[in-house]
């Protein structure tokens, strides 16, 4: 990750595709407390990665069905199957997006109407999912969801 990424710096060099504040040719001081930064989100994502064995490798990524082309939905499972993480990302930075989606119950050997537990790893909320067909809403203020799914 480049320095400044967590500050959401995105001003382009006029007439080019590179960032104006890239450290490519300079080292510059930055105000890491500036409004609009995503430092807390990056720190939380790193904690989630460390705490979940499914995220300890780049291998095993699977794409799943979400019936909205503006939502990317995928998951990873630990090698022993004990840790299952699902991620959904809103690709539209300006609008909330909603979709029905499938929980991949078949990967856990469960019937389509099985009961599973979900946990939002960004905010700690927990709930019970019933069946494989579910619904999600992702908005620009929190454009992604990271969920741990368990059977007990």
Question: Which residues make up each language-model segment?
Answer:
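Carbohydrate-interacting/catalytic domains
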Residues: 1, 5-152
């Amino acid at each position: 990750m480049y320095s400044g990424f967590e500050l959401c710096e995105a001003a382009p060099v006029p007439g080019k595709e590179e960032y104006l504040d890239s450290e490519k040719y300079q080292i510059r001081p930055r105000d890491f407390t500036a409004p609009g930064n995503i430092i807390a989100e990056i720190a939380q994502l790193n904690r989630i990665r460390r705490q979940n064995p499914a995220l300890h490798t780049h291998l095993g990524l699977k794409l799943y069905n979400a019936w909205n082309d503006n939502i990317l939905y995928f998951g990873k499972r630990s090698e022993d199957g004990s840790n299952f993480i699902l991620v959904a990302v809103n690709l539209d930075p300006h609008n909330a997006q909603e979709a029905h989606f499938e929980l991949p119950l078949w990967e856990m050997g469960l019937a389509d109407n099985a009961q599973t537990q979900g946990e939002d790893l960004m905010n700690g909320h927990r709930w019970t999912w019933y069946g494989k067909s579910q619904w999600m809403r992702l908005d620009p203020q929190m454009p992604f969801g990271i969920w741990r799914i368990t059977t007990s």
